[in-house]
Amino acid sequence: MSHQETYRHNEAYAQFLAGWDAAFYAKYADTLKPNEPGARALDVGCGVGQVVARLAEAGFEAHGVDVSEPNIERAKKFCPRCQLYDGRRLPFPDAHFASVGALNVLEHVDEPEAFIKELVRVTRLGGRIVVSSPNFFRVFGFRDYHPRMRGVANKWRNWRRLQAKRRQMRESPESVRFDKMTPIVKEPFTPDDDAIVATNALEMRFFLERNGCTVERVECTDRYVAKPIDFALNLLPTRYMMFNAFLVATRKV
C-alpha cells in the first residue's frame, strides 16, 4: 500500500484539517488567485475545502482534488467542483488552469518529482504555480517541530546536505531526487509526523525550473507577517535555510 493510501479513509485527519485557522492558508489562497476575473484555479490536496471556498467566494472557478474520501465529502459542501483522485495523475487536460497550487502536500506524496511535473502539466502557458511545504533542511530558525529540524547536529547535517545537493545539481542534474524520510508513528500526533519527503526550497525550485517554469518568488514565510519582518527574512539567500519553502512560479510561454 502506498503512503498516500493511508489517507484514503482517514476520518481523524479530515477532522484535524477542519480545525485549521484561516490565517494558516490565507497567504497561499491569495497567491493562488488568478490574475483574470473568473479564471480557473486548482488546489491540489485541497483537504476539507477551505482554500477552494475562499477562491470561489472571490469569483473564480475553483476546483479541488484530494486522495481522502472524508476530505472530499466535506470539501463538496464548500464547492461541488472538488473530487477524489489517485494522487498521481490529475484528472484534467493539459494547460487547463490559470493557477495551480499545493499547500503542505508535497512532503506527503510517494513520487514528489512526478507530482511537481503534474502541477505544471495542467497549468496553462503563462499560468501560475504555487507550492508551499515545510523546509526540512532548516539551518536557522525556531519552532523546530520535526526531529529532522532540531538540534545543532541536525542543522549541521542539513547544511552539509544542502551543499551536496547544490553540487549534484551542477554536476549530475538528472540524478537529483528529494530525500525520503520514515514517517513517525506516535501519540499525540504532531504536524508532519506523517511526512515522507524532506521538502526544501532548493529542490522545489530545481524541479519547477526543470519542468519549464520561471520561479518568481522563493520565501521562507508561508503566512502573512508584518511587512518589515517579511522583507528582512526573505531578503538574503538564507531564506533557503529557514522556516518554510513558499515558491511561486510561472509556466514559460
Feature-to-residue mapping (PLM):
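Short catalytic micro-motifs in class I SAM-dependent methyltransferases
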Residues: 104-108
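C-terminal beta-strand of the catalytic ATP-binding
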Residues: 250-253
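S-adenosyl-L-methionine-dependent methyltransferase catalytic module, highlighting the catalytic core
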Residues: 50, 110-118, 128-248
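Helix-loop segment at the mouth of the active site in Rossmann-fold oxidoreductases
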Residues: 90-92, 109
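Conserved N-terminal segment of class I S-adenosyl-L-methionine
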Residues: 1-90, 99-103, 116, 197, ...
